[in-house]
Design a protein with these regions (language model features):
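Intrinsically disordered, low-complexity linker/loop segments enriched in Gly/Pro
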Residues: 106-109, 113-128, 133-165
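Flexible inter-repeat linkers and adjacent short helices
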Residues: 1-95, 104, 118, 272, ...
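Alpha-solenoid helical repeat architecture
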Residues: 3-8, 44-49, 83-90, 123-130, ...
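Solenoidal tandem-repeat scaffolds enriched in leucines and small polar residues
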Residues: 139-218
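Tandem amphipathic alpha-helical repeat scaffolds
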Residues: 12-23, 53-64, 89-103, 130-143, ...
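Alpha-helical scaffold segments of alpha-solenoid architecture
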Residues: 178, 191, 195-304
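Eukaryotic all-alpha helical interaction scaffolds
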Residues: 19, 39-40, 79-80, 99, ...
Length: 392
């Protein structure tokens, strides 16, 4: 058997890295298959294997962002004994991204800060833009909008100056839009979404368009425009690939919530049946609890039973460490019971939402707490942008 040099494999790894950071799914998958064969025939080289392991993590995250592929538990990596600047940077970046994915936000922030120092030794503008995008996404999730906008504007400026990174520019536009939405500037938020949708149309990328329609539906929900929100969600759910991804659950939860908010119960029941059929094949405990909550809140007649079952569903989210989701549903229940005139139950859910907000604050250190945006109830679901998660 012919032994392949580590340099040859390393060169192909660089090709893979470029495909991954461009979010070129087809090419990245092709190179991934090729690399698995090359590694079987490569001479022993720990540095190349470490580089491959770290890029594989980025590859899986890309598939999660672009196609909604589920992430498995990450391989635990020891600190590489022999590294160069790029591998050392990837090491901390990879760990930061997984810490964020697992909702360990305090650790993620610390690891991102270490990675940022390592990044100073890497003269690569696109790598800088990618890093700023990921950090901006984290601060966006933590509602630190001004910090997030600082990072994402840097990324936008870089991506605009390089051809071939239109998808990454669209992802950056989404993060900017979300931050402007969080500070109540709906017009600027909509403008950024319009720019991102224009890119998806130019690329003829229907999956990306579905992700964008989901995210813009959140903007319309925040602005109290339920019909526009529902229209955007139905457009998101019109793509077959999107329907088979994990993002389906995000959009369906949002769609059901908006339909019920305008008392379209018959249409909501139709979608509940679709969700039930899909959950028989692929069950997600977080979204099962969320769907059950919506059904109990709007279809259970007895007030006491309604309140108890909703508290039970929220407790499941707490056990699964979905604090943001639990807070959102507590706020939604408080509003619903207030409208029914059940002030005591409304108070209990309002109190729960307030306590969950302080649980959220505990993710941050003291300095970050002082910068956190003022608490307000926000009936949002999770976004489909993981840059995670964010269009991706």
């Amino acid at each position: 058997m012919t032994i392949i040099s580590a340099e040859q494999v390393g060169n192909r790894l660089n090709d893979w890295r470029i495909a991954i950071r461009k979010h070129d799914v087809h090419n990245a998958k092709t190179i991934y298959t090729e690399l698995k064969e090359l590694l079987q025939e490569m001479e022993e080289n720990q540095e190349v294997l470490t580089y491959y392991s770290l890029l594989e993590g980025k590859f899986k995250l890309m598939l999660y962002e672009r196609r909604g592929k589920k992430l498995n538990e990450p391989t635990v990596l020891e600190y590489p004994s022999k590294t160069n600047d790029l591998i050392e940077y990837y090491f901390y970046l990879y760990k930061a991204l997984y810490a964020s994915y697992n909702r360990d936000y305090a650790s993620a922030i610390g690891l991102f800060k270490i990675a940022e120092k390592k990044l100073q030794n890497i003269p690569d503008e696109i790598e800088v833009a990618e890093f700023h995008t990921k950090v901006a996404n984290l601060y966006m999730m933590l509602r630190q909008s001004l910090i997030s906008l600082h990072y994402i504007q840097n990324a936008i400026d870089i991506f605009k100056g390089h051809d071939g990174y239109e998808r990454r520019l669209a992802a950056a536009f989404v993060i900017a839009a979300t931050n402007f939405m969080d500070i109540g500037d709906f017009k600027r938020a909509e403008n950024y979404y319009t720019k991102a949708l224009h890119i998806s149309n130019q690329l003829n990328d229907h999956f990306l368009a579905s992700q964008l329609y989901h995210n813009i539906s959140i903007l319309y929900a925040e602005a109290g425009e339920s019909k526009k929100c529902i229209d955007a969600l139905e457009k998101a759910l019109s793509d077959d690939d999107y329907l088979s991804s994990c993002y389906f659950e995000h959009s369906m939860f949002m769609l059901l919530k908006e339909l019920l908010s305008i008392d379209e119960k018959s249409q909501a029941l139709y979608y509940f049946e679709l969700v039930k059929q899909k959950q028989e094949i692929d069950r997600n405990p977080i979204y099962t609890a969320k769907m059950n909550f919506l059904y109990h809140l709007f279809f259970t007649e007895d007030i006491s039973k309604k309140a108890q079952t909703c508290f039970d569903d929220i407790s499941i989210l707490k056990e699964l460490k979905d604090v943001e989701g639990a807070r959102e549903l507590s706020a939604l229940a408080a509003k619903h019971f207030e409208e029914l005139g059940s002030i005591h139950q409304a108070y209990l859910f309002l109190k729960d939402a307030y306590q969950l907000e302080h649980t959220t604050l505990n993710w941050r250190n003291y300095d970050e707490k002082s910068e956190f945006t003022h608490f307000r109830f926000s009936h949002r679901c999770f976004r489909t942008n993981g840059v995670l998660q964010f269009v991706k």
